[in-house]
From Swiss-Prot:
Similarity section: Belongs to the bacteriophage holin family. Cp-1 holin subfamily.
Compartments where located: Cell membrane
Residues spanning the membrane: 4-21, 26-48
Membrane topology note: Multi-pass membrane protein
Chief location: membrane
Source species, domain of life: Bacteria
Record's protein name: Uncharacterized protein Lmo0128
Keywords associated with the record: Cell membrane, Membrane, Transmembrane, Transmembrane helix
An annotated GO cellular component: plasma membrane
Biological source species: Listeria monocytogenes serovar 1/2a (strain ATCC BAA-679 / EGD-e)
Length: 140
């Protein structure tokens, strides 16, 4: 049984590496942001008495969609020979998106959000090639 588990983990790692490329810091941080956003969404919904399994499923579907888009971006980089340029831009875009959502979840619970975290959204947007100004008003 232990051998089967080890081969399963090895197979998962190989597939993950093929789909997403090197599991570098950007990929790890994206996964952390995705998990943090989902958990903060659950906390905010629970805090407000709005927990719903349907909404939870939609949240998981969106997180899987993010990972699919990152995998597609990596495959495009392989075709173009651009060494993760597209993948990294997509990751930075979703880092900004996830951070916005995390901060909005805390605001929903009545918490104040540090300016330094709001400013990171602009940095992530710049690194993704996106220019988004609408996020400031959502967190005041």
């Amino acid at each position: 049984m232990e051998v089967i588990l080890k081969f399963g983990i090895l197979g998962f790692g190989a597939i993950f590496g093929y789909l997403f490329g090197e599991v570098d810091l950007l990929v790890k941080v994206l996964v952390c942001f995705i998990v943090a956003d989902y958990i903060s969404g659950l906390l905010a919904s629970g805090y407000l008495g709005e927990l719903s399994s349907k909404m939870g499923f939609k949240g998981i579907a969106k997180k899987i969609a993010i990972l699919i888009l990152v995998a597609i971006a990596h495959q495009i980089d392989l075709i173009l020979g651009t060494h993760n340029t597209t993948r990294d831009a997509v990751i930075f875009f979703y880092l900004a998106n996830e951070l916005i959502s995390i901060l909005e979840n805390f605001v929903r619970m009545g918490m104040k959000v540090p300016e330094v975290l709001k400013n990171l959204i602009l940095i992530f947007d710049a690194k993704s090639g996106e220019d988004e100004e609408k996020h400031d008003k959502d967190m005041d």
